[in-house]
Amino acid sequence: MSSPQDRAQQYIGQLDKELSKYPTLNNLEKTTGVPKAYAVIGLVALYFFLIIFNLGGQLLTNLAGFVLPGYYSLNALFTASKQDDTQWLTYWVVFSLFTVIESLISVVYWFPFYFTFKFVFLLWLSLPTFKGAETIFRSFLAPTLGRYFQNGSTASGLRAKADAVHTD
């Protein structure tokens, strides 16, 4: 049985191999002498630290909630598949709801570590491994609000309207 230190080194090796695909990180490693895996782990740890202690927590959380989902949403727009549309449309509805609630009430003062929990929740919603937005759609939005949208799925209806405008 391998020790925790051996397993950690194995994971760092896998991360280093994955990060080797990015020339910028390879150049950073050559320039600074710091292994790219350690640099990325350090930056991620700093990012979490800043969010946990609310040093720019709102900005960093919203940035994380926008960049990766924005990339995947744009990718979904350019694919013919409709499977990913539900995930990303639901994500943006939930993300927008959080943003509106934050602006209406000072939830930050009532709930300690709010931005930490929001950050973890947004990761759960957006990461393809978890597909949390799809889970929320299937378990909450579809059963409660589905009766108001009887003309098929909202994603396919929106796509059909966009295609109709584009062809005119």
From Swiss-Prot:
The keyword Iron does not apply. Its main location: endoplasmic reticulum. Keywords: Endoplasmic reticulum, Golgi apparatus, Membrane, Transmembrane, Transmembrane helix. Pfam families: TB2_DP1_HVA22 (PF03134). It comes from the Eukaryota. Signal peptide: none annotated. InterPro entries: TB2_DP1_HVA22 (IPR004345). Residues 1-35, 77-86, 125-168 are cytoplasmic. GO terms for biological process: endoplasmic reticulum inheritance; endoplasmic reticulum tubular network membrane organization; ER-dependent peroxisome organization; nuclear pore complex assembly; response to endoplasmic reticulum stress; vacuole organization; vesicle-mediated transport. The chain crosses the membrane at residues 36-55, 57-76, 87-103, 106-124. The keyword Transmembrane helix applies. Residues 56, 104-105 are lumenal. It is a multi-pass membrane protein. One of its GO terms (cellular component) is Golgi membrane. It is found in: Endoplasmic reticulum membrane; Golgi apparatus membrane. Oligomer. Belongs to the DP1 family. Required to generate and maintain the structure of the tubular endoplasmic reticulum network and the vacuole. Induces high curvature in membranes and causes membrane tubule formation. Involved in membrane/vesicle trafficking. The short lumenal loops between transmembrane domains 1 and 2 and between transmembrane domains 3 and 4 may impart a wedge-like configuration, thus deforming membranes. This is Protein yop-1. The lineage of its organism: Eukaryota, Fungi, Dikarya, Ascomycota, Pezizomycotina.
